[in-house]
Amino acid sequence: LKSRLVLAEHYNSITLKDAELKVNNLPFTADGTIRHFPENRHTRIDMDMGLKISDMNDLLKFIPDAYFQNRDKIQAEGSILMEGSIHGFLGDSIVPNANLCCKIENGSYHIKDIKQGIDTLEMDLDIHLNGPFPDSSFVSLEQLTMKGLNTSLDMQAKVTNLFKNPAVRAGMKGKVDFTRLGQEFLNPDTLLVEGVMDADLSTTFTVNDLVESRFGKIHSSGKLNIDKLKAFSQSLGMDIFISDAI
């Protein structure tokens, strides 16, 4: 942690100015104040944070080597914006509001000296956690667009009721060749993905209905074709296999 630190009110108030800190080795900036109220043991947090990196190629340096193959040949382009804030009181049964915005613009992803790759990558993701009114919290994927390597996908989604029984509303259109993507970029010893998915689908469901196999309560319209989908990672605890889903 590097910062200009201001202590006040008998050390009950801490102000960070131009702070630099690392979260899972990712460099972030932080500005704001944390104030403690001894009379009721509450803490007021007013903090704004942002990812210090703005270039996609620089971001790749912070992702563990185990997830890539041909890492030294990977070339990424585009800008990334990640900004967040925490505002409100923290105490017994009191949680502040938290917001996070993440955007990728004009993104692309290629292997050096190979023309084919991810030619287009765009994402706009918003997360809002409402401390006083948790039922109003949500995750909104405003846009995910990916094109290249036999893949062309557009997707939007929103998840509400996050803390009880998350409700998902999503739409996707396009084709994803997981086999090709995995072969080009991922280390199969860490994460193995195979299969092809073709979709033009809108769907709404809750996580409980999906987990409990209450498929009659899952509402979908459009088409979804999966010619074998496999995703396996021992380190991530992932083992998924879907075959001939139409």
Language-model segments: what does each one mean?
Residues D18:
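Conserved N-terminal beta-sheet scaffold of ABC transporter nucleotide-binding domains
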